[in-house]
Amino acid sequence: MEVKPLKKLRLYGFNNLTKTLSFNMYDICYAKTPEHRDAYIQYIDEEYNAQRLTSIVTEVARIVGANILNIAKQDYDPQGASVTMLIAEEHLGPENPDNDPFSPVYTDKEGPLPDAVVAHLDKSHITVHTYPESHPHGGISTFRADIDVSTCGQISPLKALNFLIESFAPDIIVADYRVRGFTRDVDGKKVFIDHKINSIQNYVDRKYRDLYQMIDVTVFQEYIFHTKMILKDFDLDNYLFGTAKKELSINDKRKIKQRLKKEMAEIFYGKNMPRI
């Protein structure tokens, strides 16, 4: 869905509103043996390494219409990766003295100007961190990725929401969106939000709304929007790593399904739960 601005809103000077989308996604699987668990962690670590994450956040920057100032990326030992990208609404550089917003992206190879880093370090940025984990009890392994897209000015991180869902295809999503600060119209009146929204679901494509069960917690007067999403359909084949469903007995299938559903419910509701 397009981010629609409020009608007839004319601002004075720069748009000082800060808009932040926090996107937390979870992938859950059953890995029967220690070897399977190690293989799952290794697979996730390679699938979502720093280079792959950099490609994802670079596309996020393109989608929201931001220019890249700098990129820092790191793979961690024994597992995990992170990427931090500084972005700006307008291109800043010696070949763009007029701050033309349609000029080419400023790449990490060229590097940002020092004052650009200072100006945008705590406001316009994209970060992603990954957290693979497993536990020997129960055979459950999980992968979490946290993505934060924070912008100031007219660009909106909500534009990247569907791309992030497509990129990770997660089992569970916890999304938070908030707007902070204020800007002013030409008459000096404060503007605390500059676009229409009553739920993050407004910006989720129908094909994903059909796939996920969703619940909202909205504090509109504080410009806080919270949406949780969990896949509606459960196919055990999609959650087995290193083991085929046909290799399991009916009783094993039932037990594994119960463990996985319990794990997913606990993550979705954010609390430990009795046996399902």
Curated annotation (Swiss-Prot):
GO CC term (a single one): cytosol
Record GO biological process: spermidine biosynthetic process
Cofactor note as given: Binds 1 pyruvoyl group covalently per subunit.
SUPFAM superfamilies registered for this protein in UniProt: S-adenosylmethionine decarboxylase
InterPro entries given in the database record: AdoMetDC_fam_prok, S-AdoMet_deCO2ase_bac, S-AdoMet_deCO2ase_core
Catalytic activity: S-adenosyl-L-methionine + H(+) = S-adenosyl 3-(methylsulfanyl)propylamine + CO2
Gene3D superfamilies (UniProt xref): S-adenosylmethionine decarboxylase
Chain positions of site Cleavage (non-hydrolytic): K123, S124
KW S-adenosyl-L-methionine (keyword) present: yes
Keyword Lyase: yes
Enzyme nomenclature, EC number: 4.1.1.50
Superkingdom, taxonomy of origin: Bacteria
Catalytic residues (UniProt): S124 (schiff-base intermediate with substrate), H129 (proton acceptor), C152 (proton donor)
UniProt pathway: Amine and polyamine biosynthesis; S-adenosylmethioninamine biosynthesis; S-adenosylmethioninamine from S-adenosyl-L-methionine: step 1/1
CC cofactor: pyruvate
Keywords, in A-Z order: Autocatalytic cleavage, Decarboxylase, Lyase, Polyamine biosynthesis, Pyruvate, S-adenosyl-L-methionine, Schiff base, Spermidine biosynthesis, Zymogen
Record NCBIfam families: SAM_DCase_Eco
Assembly description: Heterooctamer of four alpha and four beta chains arranged as a tetramer of alpha/beta heterodimers.
Function in brief: Catalyzes the decarboxylation of S-adenosylmethionine to S-adenosylmethioninamine (dcAdoMet), the propylamine donor required for the synthesis of the polyamines spermine and spermidine from the diamine putrescine.
Protein family: Belongs to the prokaryotic AdoMetDC family. Type 2 subfamily.
Name of protein: S-adenosylmethionine decarboxylase proenzyme
The species this protein was found in: Desulfitobacterium hafniense (strain DSM 10664 / DCB-2)
Phylogenetic lineage: Bacteria, Bacillati, Bacillota, Clostridia, Eubacteriales
